[in-house]
From Swiss-Prot:
It comes from Solanum lycopersicum (Tomato). This is MADS-box protein EJ2. CDD domains: MADS_MEF2_like. Residues 1-61 form the MADS-box domain. Residues 87-177 form the K-box domain. MADS-box transcription factor that acts redundantly with J2 to control meristem maturation and inflorescence architecture. GO terms for molecular function: DNA-binding transcription factor activity, RNA polymerase II-specific; protein dimerization activity; RNA polymerase II cis-regulatory region sequence-specific DNA binding. GO terms for cellular component: nucleus. One of its GO terms (biological process) is regulation of transcription by RNA polymerase II. It comes from the Eukaryota.
Amino acid sequence: MGRGRVELKRIENKINRQVTFAKRRNGLLKKAYELSVLCDAEVALIIFSNRGKLYEFCSTSSMVKTIEKYQRCSYATLEANQSVTDTQNNYHEYLRLKARVELLQRSQRNFLGEDLGTLSSKDLEQLENQLESSLKQIRSRKTQFMLDQLADLQQKEQMLAESNRLLRRKLEESVAGFPLRLCWEDGGDHQLMHQQNRLPNTEGFFQPLGLHSSSPHFGYNPVNTDEVNAAATAHNMNGFIHGWML
């Protein structure tokens, strides 16, 4: 009697599942070995258990070389297909950007008043509206710039005026006592000159004794009546009496 067909589904019993895994694993490794020996094939087998334990078989001396060979064979076609796809996408992107650049260049020429022959009436009206909008924005920005400059100049003017007031105040404070001191000095000089004017002039009244004089002198020069009258007149004019008349 032959073996019954096993239903392919997950074995719920943990022990039975582990026993089945061990049997099938060993059988698979044996089949891989037989295939590599009988058919001279390069076989690599990698198995991970449900707990993450690794089981492997490689017919060559290096599993890494076999895996690299597999990657070159499997992913080379994918890379080639990807390269073709990328090239096509890049070409479409180039065409899109080229059309965009041509449109911008044409718009620039239209803004400069060039190549207007191909534009319709609606296009010309739209272009006119765009130019008017641009002019409004430019004038508004220019006006704002001038107002900002004017505000800065007014602020600087206020700062300079304030500095001027401070300097003027300091100058007035420093010069406030100078006129009084000047008057005091002028008054002192005037008083000194007044006292000098009041000093009696004895040069005309006392003369040195001359050796050639034949008449004796007693230390003064004889004064006649006219000189006395002149002295009195001087007293009346100057408001004071000479010392020799006291």
